[in-house]
C-alpha cells in the first residue's frame, strides 16, 4: 500500500500492538503486508508457545490470508496457532483475523 508513509505505518503498528495479544513473530503477506509484517515483527516475543501473526494491508475476501495460513510450514507453527491482522477489512473477517478498520458490512 504505497499510499501510506512510513510514519503512518509506524502509527498503525503501534495501534495494533496496543490491542493485540502477544505473538512469536509477524509475517506479511506479499506485497501489501510486507511493510506491516516487518514493523510488527520487531515486537515478536520469539516464544515458541505464542502464535505467529500473519498480516496484510487489506482483506477483501480473506482468501489470501486463509491460503497463506494453510500453506505455512507446519514445523514453524505446530505448537501454536496463527493469528491475523489486517489494516482494512472490506468484509467481515474470519474469527482468527482482526481488522483495525472495518468497512460496513451490508
Cite the ranges covered by each PLM segment.
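PRPP-associated nucleotide enzymes
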Residues: 1-106
Amino acid at each position: 500500500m504505497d499510499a501510506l508513509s512510513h510514519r503512518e505505518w509506524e502509527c498503525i503498528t503501534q495501534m495494533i500492538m496496543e490491542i493485540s495479544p502477544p505473538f512469536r513473530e509477524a509475517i506479511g503477506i506479499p506485497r501489501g503486508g510486507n511493510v506491516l509484517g516487518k514493523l510488527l515483527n520487531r515486537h515478536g516475543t520469539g516464544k515458541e508457545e505464542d502464535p505467529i501473526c500473519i498480516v496484510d494491508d487489506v482483506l477483501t475476501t480473506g482468501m489470501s490470508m486463509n491460503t497463506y495460513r494453510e500453506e505455512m510450514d507446519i514445523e514453524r507453527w505446530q505448537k501454536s496457532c496463527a493469528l491475523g491482522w489486517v489494516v482494512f477489512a472490506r468484509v467481515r473477517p474470519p474469527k482468527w483475523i482482526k481488522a483495525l478498520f472495518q468497512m460496513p458490512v451490508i
